[in-house]
Design a protein with these regions (language model features):
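Mid-to-C-terminal alpha-helical segments outside catalytic/metal-binding sites
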Residues: 339-363
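Surface-exposed loop and adjacent secondary-structure segments within mature catalytic domains
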Residues: 106, 112, 121-122, 139-226
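Transmembrane beta-barrel architecture of outer-membrane proteins
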Residues: 117-125, 253
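Alpha-helical scaffold segments that flank or form the walls of functional sites
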Residues: 129-150, 306-309
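Active-site-proximal loop/turn and secondary-structure-junction residues that shape catalytic pockets
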Residues: 38, 65, 102-106, 158-159, ...
Length: 363
């Protein structure tokens, strides 16, 4: 897989001679993934500015603009997306992570209405329980991403379908099964298909969102009374198999793991459980830091500090629940201040930078 990625979707301006050690600001820039408006970019686009000036590490594409309440935010046709992604990647000094939520079924940013191939939901694949079928559909999905130049799929969902009335998981057909073994098998098939096409994947939503009764996009979500350790099994098995490229945290509150903070801000959950107990040393990506589960309870600076202390490597600001063209310089300023004042060590920043470089196949 490594060779494919180096010459494929993450290829960029790789210098012939080893580059000098990056400046702190450049390392911090790699720890951010940001959304933006527009189906095309130019010299005046803030996202191009941040890729060039601030060494922004990743972007995330959306088909629908939540704030404006209209479609066509970044995606209108295959030709348009391919051109957009090429322009974004061309601006990057370090290969850019271009990400999208293309799970399949209801959660697919590249839709048939815009000329993309149809996709199949996790729930349908799990219900059929045919690994060859899952592999076939996943390969077709990954081929679409590859053709667009999109190198990171924010999928598969490995939440268990434990609550059939879950408004954000089961009700949207986003989970393979309530059985962790079925989830694991199909997730591994899904991942293998992506790797065949040089596309990275993201397990989500750690440590488990399947039992929730509420949507963390909208506010506080507590799974303390419904979560079980069975929800960790897919993560444990996929990590053990060496197939976990990146893992996305959930903004769920679980007092059995941390009595004070939701998973994204919880050192006990990420550093303790995910890295310590489950042995994951890859990239941890936050769910969108602009979701109400975070913004309604924590200030911008506190949320960033707690996420970094918890072990998050890439902070996602989708810019789709609220829109801020200065989000990258604002976040960099906060993190630099945390380092300058000794709250966060530069060694901690280096940890994330090294993981991100490994993910991009540069270390």
């Amino acid at each position: 897989m490594g060779g494919i990625l180096l010459t494929g979707l993450l290829a960029g301006s790789v210098m012939a001679a080893p580059p000098p050690p990056p400046a702190l600001k450049d390392k911090i820039g790699q720890m951010l993934m940001v959304g933006f408006r527009g189906t095309a970019v130019d010299e005046n686009s803030f996202i191009i500015r941040d890729i060039r000036r601030n060494n922004l590490g990743g972007v995330v594409l959306f088909d629908y603009d939540v704030v404006k309440g209209q479609a066509g935010r970044n995606i209108t046709s295959p030709a348009q997306v391919k051109a957009l992604v090429a322009a974004l990647r061309e601006a990057a000094r370090v290969p850019l992570l271009v990400a999208v939520d293309q799970e399949g079924g209801k959660v697919a940013r590249l839709k048939t209405a815009c000329g993309f191939p149809a996709t199949v939901s996790h729930s349908t694949l799990g219900r059929l329980d045919d690994l060859a079928n899952t592999g076939q559909h996943s390969l077709r999905l990954a081929e679409t991403l590859n053709a667009m130049g999109i190198g990171l799929n924010l999928a598969p969902v490995v939440d268990l379908c434990t609550n059939p009335d879950n408004p954000v998981i089961a009700k949207l057909d986003r989970c393979f099964s309530a059985d962790p073994k079925i989830v694991t098998r199909h997730a591994l098939s899904y991942i293998a298909a992506h790797h065949q096409r040089g596309v990275l994947t993201t397990l989500k939503h750690f440590p488990g969102h399947g039992s929730s009764r509420a949507d963390s996009h909208l506010g506080f979500t507590d799974v303390s009374d419904t979560w079980t350790r069975d929800e960790l099994e897919p993560y444990a098995r996929i990590i053990e198999a060496g197939q976990a490229d990146a893992i996305m945290t959930a903004h769920v509150f679980n007092t059995r793991l941390d009595k004070l903070y939701p998973a994204t801000l919880s050192s006990a959950t990420i550093n303790g459980l995910l890295r310590g107990e489950l042995g994951f040393d890859g990239v941890v990506i936050s769910d969108d830091m602009q979701m109400a589960a975070i913004t309604a309870h924590y200030g911008f600076e506190i949320a960033i500090r707690k996420a970094l202390e918890a072990g998050v490597d890439i902070l996602v600001f989708g810019n789709n629940l609220r829109y801020d063209e200065e989000i990258v310089p604002r976040a960099i300023a906060v993190i630099r201040k945390l380092v300058d004042t000794g709250v966060i060590s530069e060694a901690r920043i280096d940890q994330s930078w090294q993981r991100i470089m490994r993910l991009k196949n540069l270390k």
